[in-house]
């Protein structure tokens, strides 16, 4: 009877080891092999989220059944997945901020601070994160920047259309006794 109990325990352990192996090699995890923060695309978000859940589940449910090397490997995969998801998050946040900006046609001088803030966000992105913004984003920022510069120049020139020194006009006004 003791031998049968040991056989049952051994079978249960083997089943647990097989389940741990299956969890570590789940399709969700395999689907994101090779994806890093430096090559991730927006379309990878859903598979990465599934892989993150699968990796967290494997580590949580079977952590004690993996060797130190297997656990480290799973943790490294999880870190890679989280970094890739963070890169997507950065790109999505920047795209959302760009989307909030007015078009160049609707730009006002008061939009300069918002544009500068968004340009700072975009400047902080990696090259791959910038690539995820799409082709239109840099063009929108550049067009808006040009329009705001033109508006600033207009605001700084005298309203008469004469761009000569306004101080001379004021001096003439006082001299003429006006």
Predicted regions and their residues:
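A cross-kingdom C-terminal cell-surface attachment/processing module
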Residues: 165-178
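Beta-rich interaction/scaffold domains
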Residues: 1-157
